[in-house]
C-alpha cells in the first residue's frame, strides 16, 4: 500500500523544464548564501568510506549501510549515510582555523528508509562543518548559527519568488526555540511527531533542541548516534509545509561532542565498543578540533520553496508501484 499523501486539488506550479531551472536556481543561490553566512568553503567529499574507519554515520543505530568489497585495496567499503564524522576529520587534515568551515554536496543511500512524501532512499544534502572555540560550545552560539541558516533559507526563497513569480511560498524568519523536554511537557499525550506538528503549526519556524537523550517519559524524542552531536547542544530546524500542512525538517545539526560528552554518550548508548575505532580514539584523546555542523536537505529545501507535495518531484530515486500509480493518477511526475 502506498504511503503517499496527495493534497486535494494539488497540481504542480511549474512545468518540468521550469522545475529544473528552479532547482538549479535554489541550489546555486543557497550554497552561496550559506557559505557567506557561516564562513564556509566548498570541498570535495567521498561517496563511500572504509568500514573499519568508523567514519560512517550510524544514524539511529539500526540502519544498514550499503557495503561492498574493493579487492584491489583489500578493504570493505560502505556508502555513506552522512558525512558527520568525516567532515570533522577533514577540518583537521585541511588545517581549518577557528571560525572557518567547509561544506560539501553529500550524496548518500539509506536503504532502510521508510519512503513517503518526504523520505527517499537517496539523500542529497549540503553537509557543513565549522571549527569553533571551546567557549563557543554554548546554547547561545548554537541559536545564533540557527538564525544565520534560517536567514540564508529565507533570502534564497525571496530571490526565487522574484525569478519565478508563480511560486508563492512564505517562510517565517523568526525562529522559535524549544527543547524536546519542554515540548513533551507541553503535549504529554501526543507522539513526538504530533508534538512537532502542533508546535510548528503555531510558530511556523522552530528549532527543536536537545535530541538523543531520554526524556522524563523514559524515551528519547528521536534517535541520535552518540558520537557526533552533543545531545545537549543539538537540534532540528523545522518549518511549516503549506502544501502538506505538517512540520517539515530541513536540517539536523548541532555542536559536536567533545572528549567528555563523547565518553558519556557512548556509555549511555551502550556503544563502548566504538572507543577502539580510529576516529573515536582521536576524539577521546583530544586530537580533533572542536566543531559544529549539520546537514541541510537539498531536495527538502527545493520541495519547500517550489511547493511540491512529493520529494520524487525534485529528485530521481526508486519508488514502489503503489506510489508510482498514485502519483500518476494525480498527474504528478516522479523524476
Language-model features: where?
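Class II aminoacyl-tRNA synthetase-like tRNA-binding/catalytic domains
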Residues: 2-119, 127-131
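Generic recognition of stable, solvent-exposed alpha-helical segments in well-folded globular domains
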Residues: 18-25, 29, 137-144, 148, ...
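A generic secondary-structure signal for well-formed alpha-helical elements
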Residues: 34-41, 149-160, 309
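A glycine-rich phosphate-binding loop feature that marks nucleotide/adenosyl-phosphate handling sites
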Residues: 47-51, 165-172, 320-324
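A general structural signal for short secondary-structure junctions and capping/turn motifs
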Residues: 68-70, 92-98, 118-120, 168, ...
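Extracellular structured ligand-interaction cores
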Residues: 100-102, 123-127, 203-205, 245-247
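Extended, charged alpha-beta segments that form solvent-exposed binding/catalytic grooves
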Residues: 104-190, 194
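A translation/RNA-centric and nucleic-acid-associated enzymatic feature enriched
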Residues: 109, 180-335
